[in-house]
């Protein structure tokens, strides 16, 4: 089980994720490699990782040969399927305890990532950094004294560090404050975006807070900035909740319990409607209105009801009606246990 899916507490922060990208000195960028060059790269990297005893604790899976295993592993993660498009040579090195995973030949030669519960960016970064140091003892990275780590995408130059926090902001979203906050955060080098969308509309009220800048800032500066912004978002969301009038609270509680009733008894439901109700249910658990459910159950349901997740578990691609029926079944199983 990936560690973040079981929350540390009833925090509105779901998880923290850190990923660093590295290229190997003297080797062309991933997008420029032919099949033979990729195989040489793979052989070299796996050999070096074996020398530092990383592989003994991991599954090594090539996407085109082991997609089902990778999908199962990533059921506890966000934004999976786009990640997999046209990645025939993508290699996943997945820690058996879910502590980290290494990606070879994705955006860059090497990607190291870790995810954990709550607002835990420093702890997550420490794990990634320690692993990066071990690998760097055996592999020489592409590094420039002025530019930092060299990457094929100029947006990743410098630290090549991407830090993300996943956070539930239903009250800020319902009060139409998200757009204002998004614009303000851009000025501070931070992106706030919904992880689920329907056209131009945010759905599900789960947002990703992440850094834009990787050049001209240290890793510590990036993490400190993101933690500070996240704490401000938490405070603003809690203020919205605390300042509800008596009538507003009664209406919200009714919406929460109605949503739970719908989801526990629905036979067919589309994704956007399901995410809307699951957000209410999650809020109900966070506020203590719903006491017989865990956030783990809600987290799992939100991820497993996505169309690509449902289709992956089926021998053939489902039609729209079949998807809606299976989605309802997944939700009932998650919320009635």
From Swiss-Prot:
Signal peptide: none
Binding residues for ATP: 15-19, 162-166, 193-198
Organism placement in taxonomy: Bacteria, Bacillati, Bacillota, Clostridia, Eubacteriales
Gene Ontology molecular function: ATP binding; creatine kinase activity; protein kinase activity
Reaction catalysed by this enzyme: L-arginyl-[protein] + ATP = N(omega)-phospho-L-arginyl-[protein] + ADP + H(+)
Enzyme class: transferase
Name of the coding gene: mcsB
InterPro entries per UniProt: Arg_Kinase, ATP-guanido_PTrfase, ATP-guanido_PTrfase_cat, Gln_synth/guanido_kin_cat_dom
Domain Phosphagen kinase C-terminal as annotated: residue spans: 12-240
PROSITE patterns (UniProt xref): PHOSPHAGEN_KINASE_C (PS51510)
Keyword ATP-binding recorded: yes
Summary of the function given for this chain in its UniProt record: Catalyzes the specific phosphorylation of arginine residues in proteins.
Organism: Clostridium perfringens (strain ATCC 13124 / DSM 756 / JCM 1290 / NCIMB 6125 / NCTC 8237 / Type A)
Keywords for this protein: ATP-binding, Kinase, Nucleotide-binding, Transferase
TM ranges: none
Protein's recorded name: Protein-arginine kinase
GO biological process: phosphocreatine biosynthetic process
NCBIfam families: PRK01059.1-1
EC number: 2.7.14.1
Family of the protein in this entry: Belongs to the ATP:guanido phosphotransferase family.
């Amino acid at each position: 089980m990936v560690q973040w899916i079981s929350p540390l507490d009833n925090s509105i922060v779901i998880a923290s994720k850190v990923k660093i990208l590295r290229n190997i000195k003297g080797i062309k960028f991933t997008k420029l490699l032919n099949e033979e060059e990729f195989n040489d790269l793979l052989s070299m990297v796996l050999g070096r990782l074996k020398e530092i005893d990383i592989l003994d604790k991991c599954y090594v899976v090539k996407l085109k040969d082991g997609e089902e295993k990778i999908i199962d592993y990533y059921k506890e993660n966000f934004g999976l399927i786009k990640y997999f498009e046209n990645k025939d040579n993508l290699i996943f090195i997945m820690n058996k305890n879910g502590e980290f995973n290494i990606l070879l030949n994705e955006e860059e030669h090497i990607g190291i990532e870790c995810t954990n519960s709550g607002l835990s960016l420093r702890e997550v970064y420490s794990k990634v950094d320690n692993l990066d140091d071990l690998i760097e003892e055996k592999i020489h990275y592409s590094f420039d004294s002025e530019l930092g780590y060299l990457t094929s995408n100029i947006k990743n130059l410098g630290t090549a560090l991407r830090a993300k926090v996943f956070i539930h902001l239903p009250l800020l979203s319902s009060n139409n404050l998200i757009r204002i906050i998004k614009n303000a955060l851009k000025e501070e080098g931070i992106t706030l975006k919904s992880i689920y969308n329907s056209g131009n509309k945010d759905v599900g009220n789960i947002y990703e807070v992440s850094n834009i800048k990787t050049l001209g800032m240290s890793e510590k500066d990036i993490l400190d900035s993101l933690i500070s912004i996240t704490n401000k978002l938490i405070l603003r969301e809690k203020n919205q909740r605390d300042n509800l009038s008596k009538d507003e609270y009664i209406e919200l509680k009714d919406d929460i319990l109605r949503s739970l009733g719908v989801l526990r008894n629905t036979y067919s439901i589309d994704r956007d409607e399901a995410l809307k109700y699951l957000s209410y249910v999650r809020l109900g658990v966070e506020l203590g209105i719903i006491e017989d459910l865990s956030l783990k159950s809600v987290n799992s349901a939100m991820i497993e009801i996505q169309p690509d997740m449902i289709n992956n578990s089926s021998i053939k691609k489902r039609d729209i009606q079949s998807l809606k029926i299976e989605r309802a079944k997944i939700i009932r199983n998650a919320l009635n246990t």
